[in-house]
């Protein structure tokens, strides 16, 4: 496993890169001592990676309440209405200030889960598990979060850094060739 540190004076965070690193999510989360965990994913990624991610979390943190919020897939769903679904899932989980949101997906999921984390109780922690090439090299790094409006992309958002990013290159094998060539 390779570790890089994004050095941002007040809000630095590590990026862990390596085959199988997705299965380390539980042990990495245990370092944060979360009271509750909400995994946000989509219908495409969810059926591929929700089980290994939640299994890792439950093994490391068996007493911590865990919920999964599965959203429809695609940029057209990067809306305030979809964001509300994440916030509703956080409410149903009784997420508090010590809870953590896990973004499991590409850039759309990372943007929305990060924005939800920035809004919930004026900011709770979140982590990124990017599953597309573009999200691994761009959107999961830098803290840009937000949702779209009909008038334009990312009109509502915030800069909000994750606590850490887990990049597993193995997940790219499940992407269609078109996604890889698109970056």
Where are the language model's segments positioned?
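A glycine/threonine-rich phosphate-anchoring loop and its flanking beta-alpha core
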Residues: 16, 115-183
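Glycine-rich nucleotide phosphate-binding loop and flanking beta-alpha elements
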Residues: 46-47, 108-110, 173
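Active-site and donor-binding regions of nucleotide-sugar-utilizing enzymes
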Residues: 95-127
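Short glycine-/acidic-enriched loop or helix-start segments at secondary-structure transitions
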Residues: 49-51, 112-114, 138
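ATP/NTP phosphate-donor binding region
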Residues: 1-100
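Short beta-strand segments
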Residues: 40, 70, 103-105, 128, ...
């Amino acid at each position: 496993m390779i570790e890089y540190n994004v050095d941002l004076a007040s809000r630095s965070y590590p990026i862990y890169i390596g085959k199988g690193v997705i299965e380390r999510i539980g042990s990495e989360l245990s370092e944060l001592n979360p009271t509750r965990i909400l995994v946000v994913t989509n219908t495409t990624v969810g059926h591929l990676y929700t089980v290994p991610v939640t299994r890792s979390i439950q093994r490391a943190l068996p007493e911590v309440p865990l919920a999964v919020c599965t959203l429809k897939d695609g940029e057209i769903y990067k809306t305030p209405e979809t964001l509300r679904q994440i916030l509703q899932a956080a409410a149903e989980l009784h997420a508090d200030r010590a809870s953590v949101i896990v973004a499991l997906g590409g850039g759309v999921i990372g943007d929305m889960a990060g924005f939800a984390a920035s809004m919930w109780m004026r900011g709770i922690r979140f982590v990124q598990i990017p599953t597309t090439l573009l999200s691994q090299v761009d959107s999961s790094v830098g803290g840009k979060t937000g949702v779209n409006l009909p008038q334009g992309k990312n009109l509502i958002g915030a800069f909000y850094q994750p606590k850490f990013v887990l990049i597993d290159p193995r997940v790219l094998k499940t992407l269609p060739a078109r996604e890889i060539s698109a970056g």
